[in-house]
Swiss-Prot record:
Family membership: Belongs to the serpin family.
Keywords annotated in UniProt: Glycoprotein, Lipid-binding, Secreted, Steroid-binding, Transport
Listed GO CC annotations: extracellular space
Notes on the domains: Proteolytic cleavage leads to an important conformation change. This reduces the affinity for steroids.
Disulfide bridge positions per record: none
Natural source organism: Oryctolagus cuniculus (Rabbit)
Keyword Transport part of the UniProt annotation: yes
Protein name: Corticosteroid-binding globulin
Residues carrying sugar: 74, 154, 238, 308
Function according to Swiss-Prot or TrEMBL: Major transport protein for glucocorticoids and progestins in the blood of almost all vertebrate species.
Sequence positions that bind cortisol: 232, 264, 371
PANTHER family from the UniProt entry: CORTICOSTEROID-BINDING GLOBULIN (PTHR11461:SF34), SERINE PROTEASE INHIBITOR, SERPIN (PTHR11461)
GO MF term list: serine-type endopeptidase inhibitor activity; steroid binding
Cell compartments where the protein resides: Secreted
Length: 383
């Protein structure tokens, strides 16, 4: 498959959703970065898109239109049925068993148990999104939190626990979306080369982190347009990761320029170079209540008394109390045992470059086949 930088407008089945999904991804990423400028950010935009598209099956009227248009879909060009079929296919492709990839993603709706759920809605979210709506007693808030946490812990085999720490006050309808990802590098790092090194958080803060190292031929670019350098590292399977090192103090400049066009330009401009590469070993995670970010992006009706969710339940005015998203990304040395450590085509003519991710950096992970943005991350302090 072409890289995510290929022609993203192509309407082949797994890619029909890509333009809208990628545009939504960068909009959401920028909202969250601007709301927490000094914090790590880790989101899985494609799984948030999937969750909101699923929710639209229960919406009617303006609420439904606003949800789908807010996700970037032009409803005159793409019929609604095609959107849900596209996500159904995407969910199937991303969820196919790839032994080299540990990835668990999913959505669930928790609905106050006093409301009667429409069977047609349950059937639709099961069919298209392999999801379910669960009755919850929100009057007993500690127990409701426990139910949601246990549900997600079970679904992720314990990889994601305690999503619901510190959330309180009454609710009627909560949309939960989660993803855990740990890929296998096509060209692994040698664990014996990992050493504690300094990471410069800012001018006054330095922390020690385990720093992975490899010297190999990788796709590299010193961007002539934006103040950054980057490498593209492939996972076994369809995953590919861009590690972007902005010049000192230029993180915000690079984030502001992230777009489909930028990714396409990078993909065309990267060339194989021999690089001494240092990347922190870390587990990066983010937990978000997305109400503020979505409202700022024009997806606001669902949280207000204007909401129309008559396709979920016909009892009563119903609005969404919270949209929760939890993403966990593990970066470690491991590669496929069967992969020979050769890297890309050898270019012995070039002097080796050193690229050291020892200050705040960005990471973008795409699924190459579907052009889905699996993860967008900003790493201020590797954890």
């Amino acid at each position: 498959a072409d890289p995510p930088g290929g022609d993203i407008s192509t309407r082949s089945p797994p890619r029909g959703l890509a333009p809208a999904n990628v545009d939504f991804a960068f909009s959401l990423y920028r909202q969250l970065v601007s709301s927490a400028p000094d914090r790590n950010i880790c989101i899985s935009p494609v799984s948030v898109s999937m969750a909101l598209a699923m929710l639209s099956l229960g919406a009617s009227g303006h609420t439904r239109t606003q949800l789908l248009q807010g996700l970037g879909f032009n409803l005159t060009e793409m019929p609604e049925a095609e959107i849900h079929q596209g996500f159904q296919y995407l969910h199937h492709l991303l969820g196919e068993s790839d032994t080299s990839l540990e990835m668990t993603m999913g959505n669930a709706l928790f609905l106050d148990h006093s409301l009667e759920l429409l069977e047609s809605f349950s059937a639709d979210i099961r069919r298209y999104y392999e999801s379910e709506a669960l009755a919850t007693d929100f009057q007993d808030w500690p127990r409701a939190c426990r139910q949601i946490n246990e549900y997600i812990e079970n679904k992720t085999q314990g990889k994601i626990a305690d999503l619901f720490l510190g959330l309180e006050n009454p609710a009627i309808l909560i949309l939960v979306n989660y993803i855990f990802f740990k890929g296998t590098w096509a060209h692994p790092f040698d664990p014996q080369s990992t050493e504690e090194k300094s990471f410069y958080v800012d001018d006054t803060t330095t922390v020690m982190v385990p720093m992975m190292f490899q010297s190999s031929t990788v796709k590299y670019l010193h961007d002539p347009v934006l103040p950054c350098r980057l490498v593209q590292l492939d996972y076994v399977g369809n995953g590919t990761a861009f590690f972007i090192l902005p010049d000192k103090g230029k993180v915000d400049t690079v984030i502001a320029a992230l777009s489909r066009d930028t990714i396409q330009r990078w993909s065309k401009s990267l060339t194989y170079r021999l690089v001494h590469l240092y990347i922190p070993k870390a587990s990066i995670s983010g937990a978000y209540e997305l109400r503020g970010a979505l409202a700022a992006m024009g997806i606001a009706d669902l949280f207000t008394n204007q909401a129309n969710f008559s396709s979920i339940s016909q009892e009563g005015p119903l609005k969404v109390s919270k949209v929760l998203h939890k993403a966990v990304l593990q970066l470690d040395e491991h590669g496929g045992v069967e992969v020979a450590a050769t890297g890309g085509p050898l270019q012995l003519v070039s002097e080796p470059l050193t690229l050291n991710f020892n200050r705040p950096f960005l990471i973008l992970i795409f699924d190459d086949f579907t052009w889905s943005s699996l993860f967008l991350g900003k790493v201020v302090i590797p954890a």
